[in-house]
A protein has these predicted regions:
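N-terminal FAD cofactor-binding segment of flavoenzymes
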Residues: 25-29, 42-100
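Active-site-proximal substrate-binding core of FAD-dependent oxidoreductases
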Residues: 40-44, 334-340, 352, 356-402, ...
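FAD-binding beta-loop-beta segment adjacent to the flavin cofactor pocket
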Residues: 307-338, 461-472, 485-500, 507
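N-terminal Rossmann-like FAD-binding beta1-loop-alpha1 element of flavoenzymes
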Residues: 8-48
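Iron-sulfur cluster-binding cysteine motifs and their immediate structural context
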Residues: 491-524, 530-553
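C-terminal helical "tail/cap" subdomain of flavin- and related membrane-associated enzymes
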Residues: 359-456, 468
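Predominantly flavin-linked oxidoreductase catalytic cores and closely associated redox partners
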Residues: 41-43, 124, 128-129, 133-295, ...
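Conserved Rossmann-like nucleotide-cofactor binding loop
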Residues: 18, 55, 195
Length: 557
C-alpha cells in the first residue's frame, strides 16, 4: 500500500501538558540559539505535534488545581497572556473524613495537599491555551491523527504511522478510505497519557521497564455540576477521604468551585481494588448522595462527565526514559506524585527536559540512545526527583490497606522512605468473587434513586461525555478470547468489566445459540479511560486507538 510520508525533525505524540510544554520549550531554545548566531544554525526545522482527539483538549480531563512551578518556568508572564484556562484561585480548603452518614473536618490539610492561592483550572482549556502558544511559535499541530505504529530503521525509532481511516466493521475499505501516513522524525517524543499505545510498543520493544516497578493506576471519574446562581462559593476546595470506599481500597474525592456557577466533583479509586465489583461511576453517585455532599451540590444538575486512568506508581514506576530515537514523557512515563495526586507540573517539566535533550540532538545531528540518555540525567538533577523520590514507597504502603498505609507514609515523611519496596500490577490484586462475598452473583444495587439530573446512570453520563465513534469500523477494544468471558471469568469474577468500565461498554447478553451469556462490546460508548486494559484479571483486553478524531469531547473538564 502506498502511504504518504511526512518528514519532520521532532515529533511530539500527544496533545497533553507534557508534549505541549516540550514543544514550546524546544521552539524557544531554537529561537534563542538562532538569535545568538551560534553554530550550527537551526533554521527551516519542522517541529510537529499530533493528537488523536478531534482538537487539542478534546480528551483532556483532570481535577485540576495546578502547581504552577513548571508553567512559571516555561512562560514566566503567563498571567499576562490571557489565561483562559483559569477558573479560580484556591481561597478556602477543607479536608473531610466521611462515614456513610457523617463528615468530620480535619483541623489541617495533610502534608503536601495544601493549595491555598493555587490556580483552579480546566485542563482541556489549559491544553488549548498551550496549543495556541506552541502554534504561535511555529509548531505544526495535527489534531485528529491517532498513532498506531512506531516506525523503525536499523534498530532506531524513526517516527510514527497514523491509523487508516475508512475501514468498515469487517475490515474492508469503504469508499472514504484514507491510508494512514508515515511521519518520519529524527526524534520522537511520546506523551500519550496513561497506558499509551505507542509508549507500550516502545517499552516492550526495548525492555524499558525491566528495572522498574509496574505502572499502576487509579480510575478518576469526574462530573461538572451546574448550580443555581449565587450558590457557588468562590475558590472553594474540598477533599474527602473514606466513604464510599472501604478501608482496603485506596482513593479519595475532590470538589472544586469553578467559574460560572459550577462545581467539579471527582472520585479516584485504585485499580488494584480487591473487589471485582468495584464500580467507580456508581461510587461517585453514592458520594453525591452523602448528606454532606448532597447539601452542597444537590440543587445542581450534571452537565459534563468524563473518566480517565491516573498513573499513581510514582518514582519507582518510571521506566527507562529513552531508546534509540525516542523518549517518554508525562503520564506515559508515570510522572505523577501519588502523595499529592498531582502530575501536570511534573509532566510539563519532563516534556521541557526532553525538549532540551532533543535540542542538543538536533545540534549534533545525532539521536542515538547515547545522546538521548542525557534526558534521564536531567530528570535526576531536577526538582522532579526532589519531589517524587521521597514518595517512592507511597503505593506499596497503600497495598497494606488505607489505615496501615497512611501510618507507613507518615513514618516515611518523618524518617525517610527507606529501601524501595516492590509492588504488583493492579490486576494481580483482584480477588475472585467468592473470596470477596462468599456468594454469586454480585449484590443488587437498589440504594440510589436515579433522577437523571443529579444522580445519573452510566448511559446518561456517557451522553454528558460527548463521546462519538463511527459505528461501522472495527472495534478498538480487542478481546483475545471471548469464551473466557462466558465461562471462566463469569464463574471466577462475575465479569467485572461490566462494573469497572465507567461507560457501560461491556455487557453480558444471553445468546439463544450458545445458551449462555456472551460478551457484547458497545465500543461507541468508550471514553478512552483505559480501565479495561489495566484491570482485566486475565489481561485479554487491549485498547487500541479508533479512527483519529473520535472519542469524548470534554471541553471544560
Amino acid at each position: 500500500m502506498q502511504r504518504e510520508t511526512m518528514p519532520v525533525d521532532v515529533l511530539f505524540v500527544g496533545g497533553g501538558p507534557a508534549c505541549l510544554a516540550g514543544a514550546i520549550r524546544l521552539m524557544d531554545l531554537i529561537a534563542a540559539h538562532n538569535a545568538s548566531g551560534a553554530a550550527p544554525k537551526l533554521d527551516e526545522l519542522t517541529i510537529a505535534l499530533m493528537d488523536k482527539g478531534s482538537e487539542i483538549g478534546s480528551h483532556a480531563i483532570s481535577g485540576a488545581v495546578l502547581d504552577p512551578t513548571a508553567l512559571n518556568e516555561l512562560i514566566p508572564d503567563w498571567k499576562n497572556q490571557d489565561p483562559t484556562f483559569l477558573e479560580r484561585y484556591v481561597e478556602e480548603e477543607t479536608f473531610l473524613t466521611l462515614t456513610s452518614k457523617f463528615s468530620l473536618p480535619a483541623p489541617l490539610m495533610p502534608p503536601g495537599m495544601e493549595d491555598h492561592g493555587s490556580p483552579i483550572i480546566s485542563i482541556a482549556k489549559f491544553q488549548k491555551w498551550l496549543a495556541a502558544q506552541a502554534e504561535a511559535r511555529g509548531v505544526m499541530l495535527f489534531a485528529g491523527f491517532a498513532g498506531t505504529q512506531l516506525l523503525y530503521e536499523n534498530g532506531q525509532v524513526t517516527g510514527v504511522r497514523t491509523g487508516d481511516k475508512g475501514i468498515d466493521s469487517n475490515g474492508e475499505q469503504k469508499p472514504t478510505f484514507e491510508p494512514g501516513i508515515d511521519i518520519q522524525a529524527k526524534v520522537t517524543i511520546l506523551g500519550e497519557g496513561p497506558r499509551g499505545t505507542l509508549s507500550r510498543q516502545l517499552i516492550n520493544r526495548y525492555g524499558l521497564d525491566k528495572d522498574s516497578q509496574p505502572m499502576v493506576y487509579e480510575i478518576g471519574v469526574k462530573e461538572v455540576i451546574e448550580m443555581p446562581p449565587g450558590t457557588v462559593k468562590k475558590g472553594e476546595v474540598i477533599l474527602t477521604f473514606g466513604y464510599p470506599l472501604d478501608l482496603d481500597t485506596f482513593g479519595g474525592a475532590f470538589i472544586y468551585s469553578l467559574a460560572g456557577d459550577r462545581y467539579a466533583i471527582g472520585l479516584l479509586v485504585g485499580l488494584d481494588a480487591k473487589d471485582p465489583a468495584m464500580d467507580a461511576h456508581y461510587l461517585l453517585q453514592k458520594l453525591k448522595n452523602h448528606p454532606t455532599i448532597r447539601a452542597k451540590l444537590g440543587a445542581g444538575k450534571v452537565v459534563k462527565y468524563g473518566a480517565k486512568a491516573v498513573t499513581v506508581g510514582g518514582w519507582p514506576s518510571i521506566p527507562k526514559l529513552y531508546a534509540p530515537g525516542a523518549m517518554l514523557v508525562g503520564d506515559s512515563a508515570s510522572f505523577l506524585n501519588p502523595g499529592r495526586i498531582k502530575g501536570i507540573h511534573l509532566s510539563m517539566k519532563s516534556g521541557m527536559l526532553a525538549a532540551e535533550t532533543a535540542f542538543e540532538a538536533l545540534k549534533r545531528g545525532d539521536s542515538r540512545e547515547e545522546v538521548l540518555s542525557a534526558y534521564k540525567a536531567a530528570v535526576d538533577a531536577s526538582w522532579i526527583r526532589t519531589e517524587m523520590e521521597p514518595m517512592k514507597n507511597f503505593h506499596p504502603a497503600m497495598e497494606k490497606g488505607v489505615i496501615g498505609g497512611m501510618a507507613s507514609v507518615g513514618l516515611s515523611l518523618l524518617f525517610g522512605p527507606g529501601e524501595q519496596k516492590p509492588f504488583l500490577a493492579d490486576h494481580e490484586h483482584m480477588h475472585k468473587n467468592a473470596a470477596v462475598r462468599g456468594q454469586h452473583p454480585y449484590p443488587e444495587r437498589n440504594d440510589l434513586v436515579y433522577d437523571g439530573s443529579y444522580i445519573v446512570d452510566k448511559l446518561t453520563d456517557v451522553y454528558h461525555s460527548g463521546t462519538k465513534h463511527e459505528e461501522k469500523q472495527p472495534a478498538h477494544l480487542h478481546v483475545v478470547d471471548k469464551n473466557i468471558c462466558a465461562t471462566q471469568c463469569a464463574e471466577e469474577y462475575g465479569n467485572p468489566c461490566t462494573r469497572f468500565c465507567p461507560a457501560q461498554v461491556y455487557n453480558m447478553h444471553y445468546d439463544e445459540g450458545t445458551h449462555r451469556n456472551e460478551l457484547h462490546i458497545d465500543f461507541s460508548n468508550c471514553v478512552h479511560c483505559k480501565t479495561c486494559d489495566i484491570r482485566d484479571p486475565y489481561q485479554i483486553i487491549t485498547w487500541v486507538p479508533p479512527e483519529g478524531g473520535q472519542g469524548p469531547e470534554y471541553g471544560i473538564l
